């Protein structure tokens, strides 16, 4: 099953070991929101319940690595565009951007859907 854009962001955040609180503690909102409200907002983003502004994507990417091209492709697929699914690790959702933001080389895959970082950790 293909990931939604929000599920992709959630997977990348958790692959980096960051909690909702870790991320929202350093993201400012306008208008200002409490930490609890920001946590709920991030959960809604990850559940694809709210639209995400470009400034939010930039702020999230400063907190954990993810591939903008993958996020865009998943968004287009979700909107009905007929595109092939991006190659993603089934555990950390790495593509060209690995679990720690490092490039995954062509030989960096243990299986078609499993990067060697996650294969070694299993």
Regions found by a protein language model. Give the residues of each.
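Cys/His-rich microdomains that often coordinate metals
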Residues: 49, 91, 96, 119-122
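Residues in the helix-turn-helix
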Residues: 22, 41, 70
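A short, Lys/Arg-rich alpha-helix, primarily the initiator
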Residues: 1-22, 26
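Cysteine-rich micro-motifs
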Residues: 100-122
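Phosphate-coordinating loops and pocket residues in cytosolic domains that bind phosphorylated ligands
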Residues: 25, 44, 73-76
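Recognition helix of helix-turn-helix/homeodomain-like DNA-binding domains
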Residues: 27-52
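DNA major-groove recognition helix of helix-turn-helix/homeodomain DNA-binding modules
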Residues: 50-72
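Short, charged recognition helix plus adjacent turn
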Residues: 69-98, 108
């Amino acid at each position: 099953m293909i990931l939604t854009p929000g599920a992709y962001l959630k997977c990348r955040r958790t692959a980096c070991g960051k909690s909702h609180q870790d991320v929202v503690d350093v993201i400012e909102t306008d208008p200002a929101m409490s930490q609890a409200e920001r946590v709920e907002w991030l959960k809604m983003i990850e559940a694809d319940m709210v639209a995400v502004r470009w400034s939010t994507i930039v702020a999230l990417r400063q907190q954990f690595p993810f591939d903008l091209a993958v996020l865009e492709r998943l968004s287009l697929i979700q909107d009905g565009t007929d595109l092939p699914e991006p190659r993603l690790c089934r555990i950390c959702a790495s593509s060209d951007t690995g679990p720690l933001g490092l490039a995954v080389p062509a030989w960096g895959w243990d299986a078609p859907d499993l990067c060697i970082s996650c294969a070694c950790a299993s």
